[in-house]
Amino acid sequence: MAKYTIVMVRHGESEWNQKNLFCGWYDANLSPKGVDEAAAAGKALANANFKFDIAHTSVLTRAQKTLERHYGGLTGLNKAETAEKYGEDQVHTPKAVFSRSFDVPPPPMEPDHKYYDVIVNDARYKDGPPKDQFPMFESLKLTIERTLPYWNDTIIPQLKEGKKILIAAHGNSLRGIVKHLDQLTDAAIMELNLPTGIPFVYELDENFKPVVSMKFLGDEETVKKAMEAVAAQGKKK
């Protein structure tokens, strides 16, 4: 029997999503489509009669307006062009070494990278690690290691207090929570493509185990097409 309910949503399409670029910790804004997706997400939540006490998000604009993995040296690169250069199996397939490998990080973001100074000196990260310890990349495994303590130490206690919670975050951060809740294998989570701007619901029992998993607030065909669009981002043109 479900005791707790929590709603999550991946941020709406960003300008860099629209350009098919690896975004990571770069503060890309929402695209016009992303703005529409955020509005549609709000409408879907209202139509489902959801009301929230607390909303959790990341420091980045695209999540605030609707937690992202750090794509290191891939930041700003076109996903399809990267697939062309390194091979599709390195970028976005079940055996992907870069964007969809569970424990192998992408190449590091070196100091001479185009976006290094923009990200490392971003005031949003002022409470983060010092520059000499600033992460230069993240694998999905490292992303989960960064986000799960927040789930366990902050969100779980709030659920126990009876708070109604919405998480508006990033694809990889949310995949980490989904992997944890549904006990997915490394291979299974690599196959999961979370659509932008479509809220999904988890109903949890008293032990925070799913009674209902990833119930999207959208019609099945729309969700399917949105997932396919995400999956296609790493395909060679």
PLM segments and residue spans:
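Phosphate-handling substructures
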Residues: 68-146, 193, 215
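Pan-eukaryotic secretory-pathway lumenal catalytic ectodomains of glycan-active enzymes
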Residues: 206-237
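Short coil/turn segments at secondary-structure boundaries
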Residues: 20-21, 180, 215-216
